[in-house]
Amino acid sequence: MGRRRSHERRDLPPNLYIRNNGYYCYRDPRTGKEFGLGRDRRIAITEAIQANIELLSGNRRESLIDRIKGADAITLHAWLDRYETILSERGIRPKTLLDYASKIRAIRRKLPDKPLADISTKEVAAMLNTYVAEGKSASAKLIRSTLVDVFREAIAEGHVATNPVTATRTAKSEVRRSRLTANEYVAIYHAAEPLPIWLRLAMDLAVVTGQRVGDLCRMKWSDINDNHLHIEQSKTGAKLAIPLTLTIDALNISLADTLQQCREASSSETIIASKHHDPLSPKTVSKYFTKARNASGLSFDGNPPTFHELRSLSARLYRNQIGDKFAQRLLGHKSDSMAARYRDSRGREWDKIEIDK
């Protein structure tokens, strides 16, 4: 027969004890570990009863208070649906929306669909760390950036009070792709001679205009008027008017001469075209550039340069030849004043590139 409880202990719930100094402790019946509850008898009894209920139920049932608190709570996946609507209302370009959609799908896969306010920093950090462990630090950075915005919008609509993502570490990712020099460009250009002529024309057009491969493939002869090549960048929406007199001195490539060679090579609607006069895809251009690069015999530190590196080479050569501001304008990178002017014109005006040597 167990020892009878004293008067002070008689009305206490199981597992709650009072010390001689009037201090209450709760003993976990599973481990024997004790937890201090202070000297307030009413609070100690309430917390002990709640703990006993939780331990007895084995957490199989959601408590009443949790049900009350969660009645109007939005879950992560439901909020991501709302977030996609918010993105569509921002006027973001379709390509950028597709990029967002890819990251949102990853978030849905990796994080549990529970009340948004219950998503913890620990859960987010664990999810991001899985990408880092797989050597995908760049993906971790992009997904983290998206998640920061997801919760920022949730705060704006009153669903959560804090952002659990901002406390996580930003993954460090190294740019492993090698830069391309002018001499290496020439070596790859010569290695491309056995390949279709459109590859060398695309290379020259890329380096003299500084544009992305996707925009190169979309260039049409109808884009040329008033002695300028007009380009609307698919990624940024920047509208550039590049003078046909533009020449990149380090490689002795002029835009006018390159366009003339393109005209002689094909009668297609697009400036760069296959031997059958069909438009080329960015994937095809990049693949053939890789063939020429591999055939050149050049070796590189880190990952070898891709066709996209021609844009960086163009920027560096023009920076040395004309200046940094010119290079930035040619690439479509706007200064604050230019961005303001572009916003004011609602994108109707072309940024006419001027050569000021």
Swiss-Prot record:
Domain of life (superkingdom): Viruses
Catalytic site: 212, 235, 308, 311, 333, 342 (o-(3'-phospho-dna)-tyrosine intermediate)
Pfam family name, one: Arm-DNA-bind_1
Keywords, alphabetical: DNA integration, DNA recombination, DNA-binding, Hydrolase, Transferase, Viral genome integration, Virus entry into host cell
Signal peptide positions (record): none
Location of the Core-binding (CB) domain: 74-155
A GO biological process held by the record: symbiont entry into host cell
GO molecular function, one term: integrase activity
Family membership: Belongs to the 'phage' integrase family.
Protein function: Integrase is necessary for integration of the phage into the host genome by site-specific recombination. In conjunction with excisionase, integrase is also necessary for excision of the prophage from the host genome.
Protein name: Integrase
